[in-house]
């Protein structure tokens, strides 16, 4: 089987990858021929070393050191270690790591190439299916996706360190100048407006620009990146990583209109009238409301406000609410309410800001937390105390002094099979607190009302009603992708949605041009 047939075999196994097909064929040209077995690469002598080589993550800084700053906690692999860990891959005939990745990344291929020291080719394969591999390698919950489904993990040998190798590949590519700005082979006259500069919008912008489309991205913030920039702390994703990618996109000809609030600074209809197609990729920013007495007390804040203030300070911005102490945990007893990754971001941020104590209230137990278990472990190492099976009942003080807590127990399962928390009567107590952070998740804003647009259909949850395969909405030429369609989810899903929407938009533009030519 030749190189092109090899990539067609992968494409046949995963038919919904979308426009990445063309990129895969381009990447194939960089890879030398290898023997094939059942459509997959036959492992050579450099692979299958999981029996003799143990799983070994990059060095993690000691808790007492890392909690003093906002730098990433894991070091970079040295080349020898990256090759060694990649060689543990079993090159299985059915790669469950790939099928459980929302992007269907060609993980076994770039692990093999890394093991062989062929980093340039590994990067070509990695970026063919993933717009931001350096970001996914850092923040994806690999324990729930690729690594959690690694075959050798199931056999007790410990999963391949897929995320760390993915990060290493693209970081090396940036260091060596292999990551180039987009350079379309030909420019096209059509233009697309994208509302939202988060991962979904940026992934779509990248794909469209590669086809020569004129792309303008509109965003409410003063920097692109969305939650990558302002919602995720630097100890998980250092901001220069995001800004480096933003610089590449801008250098490739994507126009950014920042500090632009659609509905206020510019109407949705104006954007729609200016472009041949529009993509809505706003994400979800509305904090899920906590209904409890005293929730409006001073010192009870929203997670996104808290994280944004902290991230702005990391850029050197003047942040009045941080400097005044309103969104600063220094010297305070902090309680964070929630059990997802945002809650983990908040508790670990509070530790670094110098809180005297940090506690996380969650209404279920540790095994039922929706967040990454790796992040829970990191938080525990850094001194966060988890208060399991506990829920807030209310707050005391005009300026918050404490959280009224009710103990819970797990009862009968809900329709999904997950046990429902039940109140234990008479179990109330007060948890002292000077700062309470609500991290209960995010909901969509009412876009039709916010933007004054008629005909844009939404679901009963407030998300934009769109075709999951194409992102088509109820308005002609208007598409939607990411969290604004599926609800609060992972960055990797937003990237996939953005790429699929870009493919659908390309089809729409081509069909429109064909009709106009008739």
What are these model-derived regions, one by one?
Residues 76-96, 119-145:
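Immediate flanking context of iron-sulfur cluster ligation sites
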């Amino acid at each position: 089987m030749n190189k092109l047939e090899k990539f067609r075999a992968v494409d046949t196994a995963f038919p919904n990858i979308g426009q990445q097909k063309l990129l895969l064929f381009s990447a194939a040209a960089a890879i030398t021929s290898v023997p094939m077995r059942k459509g997959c690469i036959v492992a050579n002598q450099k692979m299958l070393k999981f029996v003799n080589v143990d799983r070994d993550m990059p060095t993690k800084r000691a808790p007492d050191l890392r909690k003093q700053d906002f730098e990433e906690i894991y070091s970079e692999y040295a080349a020898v270690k990256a090759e060694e860990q990649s060689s543990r891959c079993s090159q299985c005939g059915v790669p469950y790591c790939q099928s459980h990745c929302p992007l269907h990344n060609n993980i076994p291929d770039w692990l093999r190439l890394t093991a062989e020291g062929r980093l340039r080719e590994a990067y070509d394969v990695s970026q063919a299916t993933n717009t931001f591999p350096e970001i996914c390698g850092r923040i994806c919950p690999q324990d729930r996706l690729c690594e959690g489904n690694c075959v050798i993990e199931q056999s007790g040998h410990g999963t391949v360190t897929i995320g760390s190798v993915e990060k290493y590949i693209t970081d090396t590519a940036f260091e060596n100048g292999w990551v180039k700005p987009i350079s379309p082979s030909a420019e096209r006259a059509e233009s697309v407006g994208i509302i939202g500069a988060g991962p979904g919008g940026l992934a779509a912008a990248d794909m469209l620009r590669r086809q020569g489309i004129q792309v303008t991205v509109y965003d409410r913030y003063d920097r692109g990146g969305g939650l990558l920039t302002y919602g995720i702390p630097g100890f998980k994703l250092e901001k220069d990583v995001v800004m480096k990618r933003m610089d590449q996109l801008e250098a490739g000809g994507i126009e950014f209109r920042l500090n632009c609030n659609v509905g206020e600074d510019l109407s949705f209809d104006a954007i729609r009238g200016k472009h041949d197609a529009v993509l809505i990729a706003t994400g979800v920013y509305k904090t899920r409301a906590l209904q409890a007495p005293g929730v409006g007390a001073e010192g009870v804040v929203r997670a996104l406000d808290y994280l944004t203030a902290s991230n702005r300070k990391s850029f050197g911005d003047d942040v009045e609410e941080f400097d005044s102490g309103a969104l600063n945990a220094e010297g305070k007893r902090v309680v964070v309410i929630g059990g997802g990754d945002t809650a983990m971001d908040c508790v670990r941020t509070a530790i670094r800001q110098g809180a005297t104590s940090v506690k996380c209230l969650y209404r279920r137990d540790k095994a039922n937390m929706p967040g990454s278990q790796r992040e829970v472990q990191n938080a525990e190492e850094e001194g966060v105390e988890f208060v399991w099976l506990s829920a807030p009942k209310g707050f005391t003080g005009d300026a918050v002094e404490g959280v009224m807590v009710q103990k819970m127990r797990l009862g009968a399962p809900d329709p999904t099979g997950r046990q429902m928390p039940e109140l234990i009567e008479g179990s109330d107590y007060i948890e002292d607190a000077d700062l309470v952070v609500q991290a209960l998740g995010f909901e969509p804003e009412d876009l039709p009302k916010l933007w004054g647009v008629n005909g844009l259909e939404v679901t009963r949850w407030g998300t934009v009603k769109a075709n999951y395969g194409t992102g088509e909405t109820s308005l002609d030429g208007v598409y939607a992708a990411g969290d604004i369609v599926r609800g609060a989810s992972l960055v990797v899903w937003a990237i996939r949605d953005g790429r699929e929407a870009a493919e659908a938009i390309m089809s729409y533009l081509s069909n429109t041009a064909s009709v106009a030519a008739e």
